[in-house]
């Protein structure tokens, strides 16, 4: 578990996480989501929204920022969507976290617990994550409880802090440090394929690649129309 501290704002709820190899079988990842993290309870999400890109050079203000957030919130709440990002606390991913935080609500989880209804999953590159030493479990047989400062900003040439509005993280370790490798992208591609397969426990998948703020100007209309299409198809 990750307890995010020193936040300007945030859910105040810890995030579950696991560190795994870039070669991990997708059936194991699916079991983790379904059986351990209960991503499909109380009902299976109708849609998975994958928002990738816009990490380092993204900036948006004013009405376009609000259009993006409202479009994402409409899709997330109407379809109980699972949202997937790269988990960074910057750029478009931070904006996604802000949007989900505003739309987030609690649902019962057993007789005496509540949990967050909207699932925001970060698939983060372990070798490019800031302060990974705080996330290493030194007692393998004991549930790790890490404290993470999510207000950190990325400096030039630095690694990436993670966003505290995410509910879960998959940290993909390909053995490399401080650089992007194709192995991470391959893991994300396999994850997308897993979501798109015909298994009844896997929802429909909607992929959006953000290159700059121009792409996001049409996001609200785009996500809304696609949500209607998927719902009608059911």
Where are the predicted features?
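Acidic/glycine-enriched connector segments
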Residues: 1-233
């Amino acid at each position: 578990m990750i307890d995010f501290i020193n936040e300007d704002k945030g859910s105040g709820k810890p995030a579950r996480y696991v560190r795994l190899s870039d070669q991990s079988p997708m059936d194991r990842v699916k079991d983790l989501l379904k059986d351990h993290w209960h991503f499909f309870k109380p009902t299976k999400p109708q849609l998975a929204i994958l928002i990738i890109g816009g990490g380092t050079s993204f900036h948006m203000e004013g009405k376009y920022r609000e259009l993006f957030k409202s479009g994402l919130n409409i899709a997330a709440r109407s379809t109980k969507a699972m949202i997937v990002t790269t988990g960074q606390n910057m750029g478009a991913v931070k904006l996604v976290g802000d949007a989900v935080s505003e739309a987030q609500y609690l649902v019962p989880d057993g007789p005496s617990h509540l949990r967050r209804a909207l699932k925001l999953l970060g698939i983060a590159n372990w070798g490019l994550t800031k302060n990974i030493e705080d996330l290493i479990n030194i007692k393998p047989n004991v549930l790790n409880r890490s404290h993470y400062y999510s207000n950190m900003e990325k400096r030039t040439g630095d690694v990436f802090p993670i966003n505290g509005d995410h509910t879960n993280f998959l940290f993909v370790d390909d053995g490399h440090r401080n650089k992007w490798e194709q192995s991470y992208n391959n893991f994300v591609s396999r994850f997308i394929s897993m979501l798109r397969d015909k298994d009844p426990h896997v929802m429909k998948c909607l992929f959006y690649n953000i290159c700059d703020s121009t792409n996001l100007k049409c996001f609200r209309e785009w996500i809304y129309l696609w949500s209607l299409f998927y719902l009608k198809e059911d």
